[in-house]
Amino acid sequence: MSTSAVPALDKTFQILDLITASQQPLTAAYIAKELKLPRSSTHNILQSLLTKHVIYKDSEGRFHLGSYLLYWAGKYEQQQGVVQLFKDLIMQYPILLQHTVTLSKMDLGEVVFLACHEAPAPLGFTFRAGVRVPAVFSATGKAML
């Protein structure tokens, strides 16, 4: 049993986390079964998320993450203001243009990549904004620890 003040919100985040972690879109029945939630609660939460475009439902009745999440991500970036500063600083120091440089933050034991300047080299790593990696498994995370 949940000790949260708002159990429905906890269920909502469980659903969103499951959809996010899945390699494929999921049906409502699968979500309810996997999370051991009542089907009616699952249905109601999914409908609420659909109306806000936090998720969308394809023609086969499967659920995907929706476009509204990009709005939140954009607003987060604006409020933090550090991504533009990061880009400006990269341009001020030309030596950095030759290297892959990431802007990251630590969040609950994970490194979250906020922005990346990629080296012009043909081979290298690509870091996408929003990707989370356990801190102990990345050089960036180890440096932060």
Model-predicted segments: where are they?
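N-terminal helix-turn-helix
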Residues: M1-Q79
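Amphipathic alpha-helical effector-binding/dimerization core
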Residues: L65-L145
